[in-house]
Amino acid sequence: ETSLQQWRFSHDKLREQALHSLSSEERIELHACIAQSIEKIYPGDAGRASQLALHYREAQQLTKAAHFYGEAGEVALRRGAPGEAAVLLEQARTLHSQVAQPRLAEIRVWRGLTEANFGLGRLREAESALRHLCMLGGIPLPTQSAHLLSMIARVGASLMGSRVGLF
């Protein structure tokens, strides 16, 4: 249906068909336009970060997509959704390997991956992310498992304590 020169799709299949009828260049341009519109209408709204990430990725603007996937992952962590955060931060990490990003952005992604994996009980993945994070920060980690697990537990307790307002 149309209203004031705008399309509104009442069924997913109609929307999918309309998207498939576009050329790849038109889809890229449409996604870029949508992302720019979201940023203009909702400036600084971190709750829109996952939408922006998706549209910038589809618009092949990978630097912006990586930024917004990282931001969306941090938002998910703050909401207490480590599973969602892990998926979003993994997208950011993948894009960081394709486009140059500031070291601080990489550190934030790896910190988030450490926290998300720890929150999900994925201790091996949390350890791996923590090792990478510390490597980026120039801080060596202990190599013995007992010392490392103790360190991870302390960091995890500190993170959880800060979430509930104990620290």
PLM feature spans:
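Short secondary-structure boundary elements
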Residues: 1-84, 94-96, 136, 140, ...
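N-terminal alpha-helical targeting/anchoring segments
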Residues: 74-97, 107-117, 121-122
